Amino acid sequence: MDLFLDTSFIIPLIIETDTTKKARHFYSTAPGTCAASMSVYEEAFFVGLRIIAEDEFGITGTAKLKEHILKEGYGFADEFIRNLNEVFSGLVIVSDSSNLSSITEIAKTHALLPNDALIVATCREHAIPKIATFDRDFSKIKDPVRVKI
């Protein structure tokens, strides 16, 4: 694998944001094999639901989102889910790191949130040298290298 895709990169491929044009252009011209993990899928799924629920229904907060899903189901996000699954079907899905000491060390050393540290550890374990992300927290990491989008 040549490039790991982060949630902050995947979401604008599917939902129109201020970074959509850049993300789509980069993705359509990216050489090599792209990868992601199931933790990124879960995060992108959740973030997409939150964005759509807020835009369409003014729903903010996880509790209200959960309540809406219990009452109405996921119908409001069918197109997003279909598109998310389509993006992921074109990626190599790598297993998330389970090296707890590595994840903790990366989080502490680079002041990263746990999920970002998990992504870094996952990239390192799978020898994925680059990450496509709009998350600036990854700019302080040298392995994987944050690519310019």
At which residue positions do the language-model features occur?
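Active-site-proximal, substrate-binding regions of enzyme catalytic domains
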Residues: 11, 41, 45-100
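Active-site neighborhoods of divalent-metal-dependent phosphate/nucleic-acid chemistry enzymes
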Residues: 82-129
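Histidine- and aromatic-rich ligand-binding microenvironments
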Residues: 5-6, 12, 36, 96, ...
